[in-house]
Structures are given as C-alpha cells and as structure tokens.
A protein has these predicted regions:
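Conserved N-terminal entry element of GNAT/NAT acetyltransferase domains
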Residues: 1-9, 141-147
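Acetyl-CoA-dependent GNAT
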Residues: 5-67, 71, 84, 90, ...
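Conserved acetyl-CoA pyrophosphate-binding loop and the N-cap/start of the following alpha-helix
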Residues: 74, 78-86
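Conserved GNAT acetyl-CoA-binding A-motif
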Residues: 91-103
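Conserved catalytic-core motifs of GNAT/GCN5-like acyltransferases
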Residues: 100-102, 118-134
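Conserved active-site tyrosine of GNAT-family acetyltransferases
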Residues: 111-113, 117
Length: 147
C-alpha cells in the first residue's frame, strides 16, 4: 500500500469506491477540483484506490480533513487509520488538525477517539436528521517519554 497525492487519473477510481460522487454532479466536480488543487490523498495498491482523504485549510484557515472514505470492501483492515495517521503527520507543522463526521457514522467516531481526537460539538441542518460532529487533535513533534 502506498499513500500519495491523487492525480487526475484517480478521479474515476475515487468515484468508483464512493457512491456520493456518482449520485451528485456537484460532489463529483468538487472532488475533481480538489484533485487539481492538490488536496486529495489516496491510499492505493497498484492502480486500485482503497481509500482517499481531502485535506484543506478551509476551516478558519486551520487544517481540516473534509473527507475520509474507505472502499466498502476494504473496511476494517486499518486503511482508514493509516490514512488518518498520514493526514496528522502532514499537519504537524500546524500543531493541530480538525475534522467532522455525521452522528450516524459510528465507525469514524470510534476511529477519531482511538487516534486521540477531542469532540467539540455538533451542527444541525447540514444533513437532515444527521448532525455533523466536529473534532480536533493537538499535534506535537515531541516523542513520548519512556519509563
């Protein structure tokens, strides 16, 4: 497995694993624009995209993981955690990273808790009946002290 920036040729691969861009032209266009802006990262095995993440500075100029998606058939294999850990590493110089997920997305909430993210609150009205929950994590280059 390799994590790399997405290329224009990955758009079709990304939309093949995530049903939202196939169902929404605007979401498809958003992912394409994000690839051109060099904010999309993929976890790939050969030419197959297993997961992708979109990392921007769109949240009050803070690093924000706008999207993290793992292909259905590749879930529960650690791909989400691997990609999330890389996004954290990319944000080290900023000292923090933010993200959000729907209240209904329990697996992502569990992953964020496992990785040490702190829950800050929720916003209603973005997805009808499914509030968005916001999280952040302080990042440090310091290595843990061993006893």
């Amino acid at each position: 497995m390799k994590i790399r920036r997405a290329r224009s040729s990955d758009l079709r691969r990304i939309t093949s694993i995530d049903p939202w861009p196939r169902a929404s032209k605007s979401r498809h266009a958003w992912i394409g624009a994000s690839i051109r802006a060099r904010t999309v990262w993929v976890l790939a095995s050969g030419t197959a995209v297993k997961a992708y993440a979109i990392l921007t500075r769109s949240f009050f100029q803070r690093p924000f993981i706008e999207q993290l998606y793992v292909a259905n058939e590749d879930r529960r294999r650690g791909h989400g955690e691997t990609l999330l850990a890389r996004m954290e590493k990319l944000c080290l110089r900023h000292g923090e990273v933010w993200t959000s997920t729907n209240q209904s997305n329990r697996p992502m909430q569990q992953l964020l808790k496992k990785r040490g993210f702190i829950r800050h609150g929720r916003v209603t009205g973005l997805d009808k009946g499914d509030p968005e929950i916001f999280y952040s994590k302080r990042l440090s280059r310091k290595k843990p002290v061993r006893a």
